[in-house]
């Protein structure tokens, strides 16, 4: 049976979330998984515990990334030598189920599976590529060509990153629907297999008040207790202003901390 391969989109700004995701992929999957991490900050790839290797992405494309890793997911088939399957996952997620069930599911002849109608408010059929299952033998992405065509005005960056009909008119990739429970946007229910904290302004490690913030902190604290997420990881993220300053001692609300900060700020006015 083919070994499970999972690629995570990440960078220095999402190092804490990345480690949390890795911890729960390994915990909830009973077989060995090869985990590859795209570090968009350093244009490199990290496989399991091996040293990072540089990636062949031009600076032109790297500088077009919306997040640190937006374009890197399209390198996956070439990294896999156009063979076998691979999963891509954004780092701001927690895997709650056996990811092997996603990897080995029937793809029904599609080139890749992604979240259908991911952005329904836009009024257009757009695919959510933050979790994907790819048949690497069928997905032959030409990133440089895509950006040439974007600059020519054939379609936009959003069309490319969400595989809209404008993009697919030029590149007829066969995209099929992924079970949405494998990419549950800012929601948790009894069938959720992977929760995606996709709203950048309310992610629990950055802000107070997310409806499922307590869930994130429960998982975060377990990974800390097991030593997988370390104080050093957290201190570095705080120093770089990537996470909340109270992350070490926070609950999902940390009202006391923020009241203290408010009192200090008010006192500073007098």
Segments from the language model and where they lie:
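Active-site-proximal specificity loops/subdomain of glycosyltransferases
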Residues: 34-78
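Conserved hydrophobic/aromatic beta-strand scaffold that supports enzyme active sites
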Residues: 76, 112, 129-133, 175-177, ...
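A glycosyltransferase accessory/donor-loop signature
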Residues: 2-4, 10-15, 31, 37, ...
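GT-A fold catalytic core of metal-dependent nucleotide-sugar glycosyltransferases
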Residues: 72-117, 124, 133-139
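Short, acidic, metal-binding catalytic loop of nucleotide-sugar glycosyltransferases
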Residues: 24-32
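Extracellular/periplasmic catalytic domains that process cell-envelope and extracellular macromolecules
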Residues: 123-126, 187-189
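Short, glycine/acidic-rich beta->alpha junctions
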Residues: 17, 68-69, 94
């Amino acid at each position: 049976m083919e070994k499970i391969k999972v690629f995570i989109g990440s960078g220095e700004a999402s190092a804490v979330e990345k480690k949390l995701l890795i911890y729960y992929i390994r915990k909830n999957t009973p077989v060995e998984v090869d985990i590859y991490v795209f570090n968009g900050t350093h244009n490199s790839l990290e496989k399991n515990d091996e040293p990072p290797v540089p990636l062949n992405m031009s600076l032109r494309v790297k500088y077009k990334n919306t997040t640190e890793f937006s374009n890197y997911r399209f390198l996956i088939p070439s990294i896999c030598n156009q063979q076998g399957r691979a999963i891509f996952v954004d780092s701001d997620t927690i895997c709650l189920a056996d990811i092997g069930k996603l990897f080995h599911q029937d793809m029904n002849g599609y080139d890749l599976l992604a979240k259908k109608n991911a952005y329904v408010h836009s009024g257009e059929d757009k695919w959510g590529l933050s979790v994907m299952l790819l048949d690497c033998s069928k997905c032959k992405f030409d990133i440089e060509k895509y950006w040439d065509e974007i600059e020519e005005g054939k379609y936009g960056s959003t069309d490319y990153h969400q595989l809209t009909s404008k993009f697919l008119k030029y590149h007829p990739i066969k995209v099929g629907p992924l079970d949405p429970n494998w990419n549950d946007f800012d929601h948790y229910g009894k069938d959720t297999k992977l929760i995606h904290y996709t709203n950048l302004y309310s992610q629990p490690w950055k802000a107070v008040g997310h409806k499922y913030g307590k869930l994130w902190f429960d998982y975060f604290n377990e990974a800390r207790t097991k030593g997988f997420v370390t104080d050093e990881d957290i201190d570095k993220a705080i120093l770089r202003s990537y996470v909340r300053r109270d992350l070490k001692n926070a609950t999902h609300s940390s009202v006391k901390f923020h009241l203290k900060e408010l009192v200090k700020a008010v006192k500073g006015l007098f």
